[in-house]
Amino acid sequence: MSQSQTRRKSTRSKSSPYFNEKKTVYVANDDDITSVLFYPTTKEEKKTYINPKTNHKVTEFHYRVYDLVAKIPKGQVTTYKALSNQLQSHPRAVGQALRLNPFCPLPIPCHRVIMTNKSIGGFNGGFGNCQFVANKKAKLAKEGLKFDDNNVLVSNINGDDSIFDKW
């Protein structure tokens, strides 16, 4: 920087709303883990089913993701990465399929899928402190899982923080 240039001082004062923001606490408004929706089981049903979220047919890859997620037992979680490894795919592709899941909460419990670092994230595109994460945490708590204040898995129904991967 030359001598003729000066550094700009911050114009924000301590009274600026950016300095005094209060953290919003989200309360779950959807903790349903019991509703069972129709799931196509035959080839013909799968071929003709229209996803109400997209108004398009569900892809073969999405059905592969959903079939695998359906195997995750209540009180357990797996990761997007573990699913993608099993499917020989990518975690983002798995997340995209779950974001469009029209069969939740059951028979396809996408709320049982968490990030590789064992934190809740990606649920309906939500990360961090948001309504979607609060809802997912409430669903998992109803199934016996515990998370810390940063939404990281502390224990599953077995009392440990293991990830389900027994496909």
Predicted regions located by residue number:
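Short Lys/Arg-rich cationic patches that frequently serve as NLS/NoLS or arginine-rich RNA/DNA-binding motifs
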Residues: 2-21
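Nucleic acid-binding interface residues in structured DNA/RNA-binding domains
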Residues: 17-167
